[in-house]
Regions:
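Short, solvent-exposed helix-loop connector elements
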Residues: 163-175
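Mg2+-dependent endonuclease catalytic cores in nucleic-acid-processing enzymes, primarily RNase H-like
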Residues: 1-161
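Generic macromolecular interface patches on structured domains
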Residues: 25, 106, 164, 193-200
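Generic alpha-helix initiation/capping and coil-helix boundary signal
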Residues: 147-148, 176, 180
Length: 212
């Protein structure tokens, strides 16, 4: 989702909500601009007033300077911080395109197909419709709507090969944004690095199976 909340604490809480909702293993965080402050906030105890839940700290897994901020020695190391340079962003763009070409990224179906073939068999979703609970109904439909928005966003982006460095620059056209593209491409970049790490440590095992 594209989140324009200015408050870094609220952004951190929203990230924790999604982390819990999807039972995620990792958080990939763009640390440019306000991202570093969000990272520091995620490394502290957070209280979610909306859900009445207290979240324990999480810890940066790939940057010792960031990790030092976390005061909890038992915090789970699961935040992958990216401080993207022009070259890193170029590598991420090339990597993401390759993943798409090789069909290594499976997108959700569009919302209309989801309603007919997936959500129609979900009793909670049908109850939300019958009781006119639009909030819960949207919660079920949102992942599919956000996927459509991601695909549309990517289609509108402009790509330029810089003549001096050969790096690929990705930028918005007009009032369009690239928040969803950044989230998805950074996530794909991290997963590829994780897969390489797993392959690199496979000497201790007879074989390793990787499933995308």
């Amino acid at each position: 989702e594209s989140n324009q909340i200015g408050d870094t604490v609220k952004q951190a809480i929203r990230i924790r909500q999604l982390y819990e909702d999807f039972n995620a293993d990792y958080i990939v965080l763009d640390c440019r601009n306000g991202g570093t402050q969000i990272l520091y906030t995620l490394q502290k105890v957070l209280y979610d007033e909306e859900r009445g839940i207290e979240y324990p700290p999480l810890k940066c897994m790939n940057n010792d300077e960031y990790a030092k901020v976390c005061q909890d020695p038992f915090a789970k190391e699961c935040i992958f911080a990216i401080n993207a340079t022009q070259n890193i962003n170029s590598d991420i763009a090339i990597n993401f395109r390759q993943n798409l070409v090789e069909n290594r990224v499976d997108f959700l179906v569009n919302s209309e197909v989801a309603k007919e073939e997936i959500l129609d068999s979900n009793q909670d979703y049908k109850n939300a419709i019958s009781t006119d609970d639009t909030t819960e109904q949207v919660d079920f439909e949102k992942p599919f709507l956000e996927t459509q928005a991601l695909i549309s966003e990517c289609a509108e982006l402009q790509y330029e090969k810089l003549p001096q460095t050969g790096a690929i620059k990705v930028y918005e056209h007009g009032s369009n944004r690239k928040d969803r593209y950044t989230s998805c491409s950074y996530g794909a970049y991290f997963l590829d690095k994780l897969a390489l790490d797993l392959l690199g440590s496979s000497d201790d095992y007879d074989y390793t199976t990787l499933i995308n």
